[in-house]
C-alpha cells in the first residue's frame, strides 16, 4: 500500500514548526539547522616557544564572503567561542600560515572547556617545512566533535611553535577559518 501525505509544515501541538517543505522539495528543519563561521581578521604572529590563544576572529555574514550563518549562532569574545544551543557540534578549523624562519613545527590545539572546568584537547603538531631564506606556506586542518551541554561550555584555539610564524588573516582574506555545525542533540 502506498500513501502520499501532502503538507507544507509539520508542527508540534503547541504550534512550533518542526519542518517545512518548499515547492522544490527542500526540507528545512529550523530547530536542527545551525552553522556559524568565523574568519581570522588580522595576521596572527605565533612567537617562538610561547603558548598563545588566537583572539582575532570576526563572524562571517553576507557581507564577509557571502556566508550567512544559519540558526542559533555561536558568539566569540576574547578567544572564547560559545553558543546558547546545546548539542553535539562538528568544529572545523583551517589555518593558513607562512614563515621565513626555520619553524619546523606548529602545535595547534582545539580546546574544549566543559562548564567552567579544565580545557580538554591534546597537542597536535603539524610539520612546517624548513626554509632557506625564503617564505614557506602551510595549511593545517582540525576537525573535532564536542558535546555542548551548558551555557558555560567553550572552545578556544591555542598555538605554539619553535620559531616565529604568521597565521594568515585579514579583513579581505578568507584564509584562516573556523566553523561550528550542529549535528545532534546533546548527550547528557
Regions found by a protein language model. Give the residues of each.
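Residue-level signal for glycine
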Residues: 15, 116-117
Amino acid at each position: 500500500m502506498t500513501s502520499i501525505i501532502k503538507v507544507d509544515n509539520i508542527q508540534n501541538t503547541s504550534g512550533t514548526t518542526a519542518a517545512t517543505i518548499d515547492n522544490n522539495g527542500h526540507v528545512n528543519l529550523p530547530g536542527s539547522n545551525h552553522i556559524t563561521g568565523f574568519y581570522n581578521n588580522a595576521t596572527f604572529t605565533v612567537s617562538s616557544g610561547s603558548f598563545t590563544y588566537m583572539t582575532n576572529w570576526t563572524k562571517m555574514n553576507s557581507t564577509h564572503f557571502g556566508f550567512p550563518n544559519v540558526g542559533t549562532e555561536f558568539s566569540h569574545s576574547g578567544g572564547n567561542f560559545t553558543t546558547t544551543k546545546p548539542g553535539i557540534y562538528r568544529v572545523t578549523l583551517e589555518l593558513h600560515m607562512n614563515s621565513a624562519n626555520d619553524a619546523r613545527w606548529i602545535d595547534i590545539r582545539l580546546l574544549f572547556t566543559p562548564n567552567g572546568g579544565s580545557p580538554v584537547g591534546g597537542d597536535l603538531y603539524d610539520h612546517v617545512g624548513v626554509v632557506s631564506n625564503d617564505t614557506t606556506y602551510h595549511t593545517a586542518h582540525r576537525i573535532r566533535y564536542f558535546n555542548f551541554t551548558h551555557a558555560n561550555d567553550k572552545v578556544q584555539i591555542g598555538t605554539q611553535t619553535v620559531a616565529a610564524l604568521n597565521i594568515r588573516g585579514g579583513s579581505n582574506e578568507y584564509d584562516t577559518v573556523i566553523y561550528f555545525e550542529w549535528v545532534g542533540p546533546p548527550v547528557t
